[in-house]
């Protein structure tokens, strides 16, 4: 038995396929989902989700949202999703380093919140390309 995983963004269905396992970046840490998981709804943080299908792990950068797990179906609603194939390695690394520097230099609450958002997004994209070894 497998999971049916569907990742939806506001403008398209990003992923709709079966998987053996999925690891979600929730607001309280990573959460793994296997078949026959208890039903739940969880908020998703900006981060990397890992989808295992046929012994292959597929990393996907998710930009925050929600996940519903019910009856071996995982429905993920996110603001944006990106795979390693659509992210330039050099671009992701430069954006990550710039975001890290900006976060370290941020002053004041508003600037820190904005810099943290940009950093999390850049880190997720960078982790996706690094995990796939592109």
From Swiss-Prot:
GO annotation, cellular component aspect: chloroplast thylakoid membrane; proton-transporting ATP synthase complex
Keyword Plastid: yes
Keyword Membrane: yes
Membrane topology classification: Peripheral membrane protein
Domain of life: Eukaryota
Coiled coil location: none
Name of one Pfam family that matches: ATP-synt_DE
Signal sequence segment: none
UniProt entry keywords in alphabetical sequence: ATP synthesis, CF(1), Chloroplast, Hydrogen ion transport, Ion transport, Membrane, Plastid, Thylakoid, Transport
Cellular compartment(s): Plastid, Chloroplast thylakoid membrane
Matching InterPro entries: ATP_synth_F1_dsu/esu, ATP_synth_F1_dsu/esu_N, ATP_synth_F1_esu_C, ATPsynth_dsu/esu_N
Main location: plastid
Subunit: F-type ATPases have 2 components, CF(1) - the catalytic core - and CF(0) - the membrane proton channel. CF(1) has five subunits: alpha(3), beta(3), gamma(1), delta(1), epsilon(1). CF(0) has three main subunits: a, b and c.
Family the entry assigns: Belongs to the ATPase epsilon chain family.
Protein task: Produces ATP from ADP in the presence of a proton gradient across the membrane.
Record's protein name: ATP synthase epsilon chain, chloroplastic
Source organism (scientific name): Chlorella vulgaris
Name of the encoding gene: atpE
């Amino acid at each position: 038995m497998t999971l049916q995983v569907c990742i939806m963004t506001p403008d398209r269905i990003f992923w709709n396929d079966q998987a053996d396992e999925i690891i979600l970046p929730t607001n309280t840490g990573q959460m793994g989902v296997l078949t026959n998981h208890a039903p739940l709804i969880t908020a998703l943080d900006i981060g990397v989700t890992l989808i295992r299908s046929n012994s292959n792990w597929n990393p996907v950068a998710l930009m925050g949202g929600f996940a519903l797990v019910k009856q071996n179906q995982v429905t993920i609603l996110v603001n944006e999703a990106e795979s390693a194939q659509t992210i330039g390695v050099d671009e992701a690394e430069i954006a990550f380093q710039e975001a890290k520097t900006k976060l370290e230099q941020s002053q004041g609450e508003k600037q820190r919140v904005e810099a943290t958002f940009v950093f999390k997004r850049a880190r997720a994209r960078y982790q996706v390309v690094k995990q796939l070894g592109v």
